[in-house]
């Protein structure tokens, strides 16, 4: 029907960005997701009636990565640090119906090789309801079609490594109803 589960998932991420520090439950949600899913199997929980993860399930997977010390937060972002790893989650709701340029600037980094990973979830990547609609919204799904949706309904993932000394800046675009997690972690750090 007309229910936009990706937009709902992005609103949940926005709520977490605004309430970080007051809501301690979110890092544990994905671990206990079975208890959050509807027991009736009607698809009203985090999984579809066929057991496919909805966009909200994927959001909880990204939020689960936000362990650590809160560095900064705003209405559409949250930044945390866990050891030498820095994670910044951005969310762009459909109320802001334009692509927004977002940047992460990390300073005080030790010289070394770092791994930069991005996870992107939105209507074009990771949203099972959007994929289902583009398949033609069949009344029944074959095993192959279910496997295809399960495989494709994952956040887009990108990894790069580079040598950094002192400061690093990452810049990208966040589209409407999209959630973006940027993670900077040391691959090798010089300790002197």
What are these regions, as identified by a protein language model?
Residues 1-99:
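Aromatic/acidic polysaccharide-binding cleft in carbohydrate-active enzymes
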Residues 9, 16-31, 110-148, 153:
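Substrate-binding clefts and catalytic carboxylate motifs of secreted carbohydrate-active enzymes
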Residues 71, 100-107, 114, 157-168, ...:
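Generic detection of short hydrophobic beta-strand segments and adjacent strand-loop junctions
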Residues 75-130, 134, 177-183:
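Carbohydrate-binding surface patches
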Residues 139-192:
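C-terminal beta-strand-rich structural cap/linker in extracellular carbohydrate-active enzymes
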């Amino acid at each position: 029907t007309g229910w936009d589960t990706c937009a709902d998932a992005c609103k949940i991420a926005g709520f977490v960005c605004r309430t970080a520090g007051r809501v301690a439950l979110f890092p544990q949600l994905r671990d206990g997701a079975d208890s959050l899913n509807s027991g009736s199997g009607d698809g009203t929980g985090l999984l579809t009636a066929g057991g496919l993860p909805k966009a909200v399930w994927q959001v909880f997977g990204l939020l689960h990565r936000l362990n650590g010390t809160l560095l900064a937060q705003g209405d559409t972002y949250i930044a945390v640090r866990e050891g030498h790893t820095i994670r910044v989650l951005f969310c762009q709701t459909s109320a802001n119906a334009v692509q927004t340029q977002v940047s992460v600037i990390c300073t005080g980094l030790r010289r070394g090789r770092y791994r930069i990973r991005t996870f992107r979830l939105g209507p074009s990547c990771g949203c099972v309801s959007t994929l289902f609609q583009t398949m033609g919204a069949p009344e029944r799904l074959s095993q192959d079609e279910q496997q295809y949706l399960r495989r494709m309904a994952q956040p887009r993932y990108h990894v790069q490594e580079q040598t950094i000394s002192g400061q690093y800046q990452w810049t990208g675009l966040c589209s409407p109803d999209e959630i973006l997690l940027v993670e900077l972690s040391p691959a090798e750090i010089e300790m002197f």
